[in-house]
């Protein structure tokens, strides 16, 4: 996903009327006084919260050089239709964000993307012009949470709210330092809770708000009307580059859980079952002929020697529930398993080809970098022959996975199939999300080892057949459903 999702823009909530319709009663003489208990100002809340919100300054030196295209060989570039743009030089980048003091002895929560790659981090307290050097205690890209520490005492720590109790419609305030303007406060409501599936981070459970979250607000506080921390402001969605009133905050309960792990261990420890999953869509369920099952987490890949493999989980299984709690999508499964301690037991309810099965497994600890895609870079051979291309599915050109292509695409040795060399964006495959460089491994549960295998399978398909494709893409295997023409 483009980094623009982390770009924070200005927005306006307009005039806010902080009284109920019963606060005034029209009379011939005018209006009656405001009734006791009606909130007419959030100033007391802001005065309580603002000292806990800090400015985070970062410095980073970036090197720009080499190719933006992974293939240095002309034949491979021609094969994939790529170009070879060049950029050179170094640049020092100054970053600006916000943070929240969470303990009197100097621990500060912020967003990971605010401090990611920073060589120096400084913190400004309130409107004090002085800056304090901050140490990075730990980061968690999976949730976009980072924990910093400054060597100061008796700091005004914020109070945490129970973000699980947050509801759409609740009034919230966003406090941060947009564009370097310290102690800026905006107001809105919670638009939704439990937002995910946007590809911002691996573990998404965002609070959505229409409170203005601007550039520099990332890492700042989203608070309730009691002045308690509901979330850490993280991102805003925009198609135009301007504000559209759709901001996202990391729930306080999740941020606190990550913070405690970072503070105690310097890293986040998560449960792990060793299965790559995706959300089961109605189209996939239809292609897989799963009657009565339209939601869940579809297993696209099972890691060797993992808890999933040891207990008998297979690709194509649909995880419908964990410990009796229904799973509606892959996001829910990741959050649930990730929040469980390694060594704990998990009972999985699984739909396998229409049959319900139950598996009990013991969670392992998630290995570092498990969600990273690909592996170490390798240099292609100096000379490469272009493999022959064959077109299938009305606009998908495929070829065999040669040694050169395997090296260029950084494909694991156990990934076999037909690589997509070219694809028509308007073809069924293009519309389903297939892209150049993907490797087709199965079609309707029939294995594909070569382009010839794929051609043979495709010839036996009827025009009205739904097509279920297992594909290796961006470091993972998953499923794609192609609708008939």
Model regions and ranges:
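Catalytic nucleophile loop of clan PA
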Residues: 100, 212-232, 429
